[in-house]
Amino acid sequence: MLKSLKQLLRTPMKTCLFFLLMTAATALLVLGANLWAQTQAQIDAVEKQFTTLGTVEQKPNRTQMRTGWNAADGAYYSEAEPVYDSVISADVLDFDGANYLKAPEKRLYYLADLQGLAVRDGGTALFYPVVEFTPAETAVPDHSIKVYVQRFLYPEAENQNNEYEIYVCDHWTENPAPLEAGKTYVAYTNVIVNHHENAKSSIEYALIAAERSTQCDAGGNLLESDMQARTFDEVTAGFYETERGQYWLELSKALSMWDTTAPVLPVTDTALLPSFHDRTVYVREGRTFSAEDLENGAAVCLVSEEFARKNGLSIGDKVELPLYGVNEKDSPHRTFGDGSGLRTFSLLNAQNRAYTPFWTAKYEIIGTYYSVGTYGKPAGSIEMALNLFLIPANSVKADFAGNIVDNGPMQRATTSFQIPNGTIDDYMAAYNRNVPAEVRENLEITFDDNGYSQIIGGLLNMRYVAIILFAAGLLSALAILVLLLYFFIVKQKKRTAIERSLGMSKNQCRVSLASGVVVLSAVAVILGTVASTVLFDKVQTLDLTGQNEHTFSTEYSLWARDENAVETEDAENTGVLEVVIPAAMTVLTAGLSVILVNRSLKYELIEMLNK
């Protein structure tokens, strides 16, 4: 082998040139391979960690002004409200080419009466009582008039007597009927600040018109109710045995149940919930739903950390959920977002009766979730709410067609679907082809991929660069190897003939010719690999994919945890490549060297001397 190396050193310039070229080609080849493997690992990690969620909202056909009377101002007020000519079903999104990972779903939520658990702090009872009262004098209640409370139907109170004075006003009626002294009346009231001039009390009990049922059938149609929209009724002998009297008792019963009501959201997959998708909600203790839980409808649930702490609940405890109402219109956040329980639907059915449970079961707590930003967001803009229970949708095995408290169009917080990452343009093209224009103009689809498009773009560019480096290194290494073997083996036939003439065996000739070339190549390959490792470490410190470019700080973002995981994702096989590639190149050099030497040894000595 030493003689072989000495022969190489007889042409130092050529040997040095091939050595440096082989070193550079190997460095380029290994660097390209490492970058390719590293980038591919990051792409795979991004594909696993990121999802693309689409949300759907039906736009109103128009808005109309709803007017009402304000007795304190002595004038009408106006409020804009949306008008929908019809409700578009989520089924219109089932079209060719959609390629859903998870098909569109319009989520409903249940109302559960949690007797014995802390749900709210009595807001409804304090500000929306049902009162029996007797006027101190006959008067028209277009201003605050003094009355004596006979009793509260809701909330029930101890030691009720007629010495309790309050001031009532038929605040929202332009020409109210008079209240007569000595008679007893019952009314549903709202405690508000008294803005009347010369008011004798800082607060007043504003009379509220009778609740008209918002119950809908299974097709989403509003059921007719014969309730008269009066703000009060006179209480006479036997009044509560009449249909009108039963209304007040049922309303009081429903309001009492409402005080202990919490929302329950049935889940088919937490990946379809926008708050779980954007990581503003995540399970911090216990576990989330398994695929088996969701498919089999296991009686398990997730509750908020705050609710569990407030009620002394922990993982493994069971909570009974009597479900009595179904809201197919809004997300739980619209009513329960801040915990106040202010409703946009009636608690009475079309027969003016309180709803009764259609499904009751005990659910085991398997995890508690932490929620960021439930407060302070516009009502109904997200699906999460205070005291919200999450349960598998398949766990409710009863028909609830008779308990639908409201129905309405698709909203971003209630309707979502999932598509493969990077296919938003393909989806919208199929959507525009297959969904009629008159439907599309009334729907608004919004996508959120959590920054996947920006991150994957940089990674794909980096992979393209890595492939180019790898290809350039591979072609360069092969070309240099061919030239190396040509000059130091193929062109050495005369040398082989002389060595054979001097009595060297064929094996000795093989060693003489090939060993030096193999050693030279091996050393160059090793140095090139070392150089590529240093370069690879330097490249990893650079932001070549643009992942770190932000227009805002993510230091305190929940999503930043996952972004960092992607940025620091290492390919498990980069170390293997730094061994396999040099070894393969060395073996290839040795193999080709032996093949070429054997080919030369087939010639006769005289023939080789003439080469």
Predicted segments with their positions:
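Basic-flanked hydrophobic alpha-helices used for secretion and membrane insertion
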Residues: 37, 41-107, 163-167, 176-184, ...
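Alpha-helical transmembrane segments
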Residues: 14-72, 531-540, 544
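Short juxtamembrane loops and helix-capping segments at transmembrane helix boundaries
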Residues: 535-577
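N-terminal Sec/SRP start-transfer signal
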Residues: 1-30, 514, 602-604, 610-611
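C-terminal membrane-exit region of the final transmembrane helix in multipass inner-membrane proteins
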Residues: 4, 484, 571-611
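Hydrophobic alpha-helical transmembrane segments of multi-pass inner-membrane transport and secretion
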Residues: 13-40, 457-497, 517-535, 581-593
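Structural detector for short beta-strands of small beta-barrel domains
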Residues: 90, 105-141, 147-151, 367
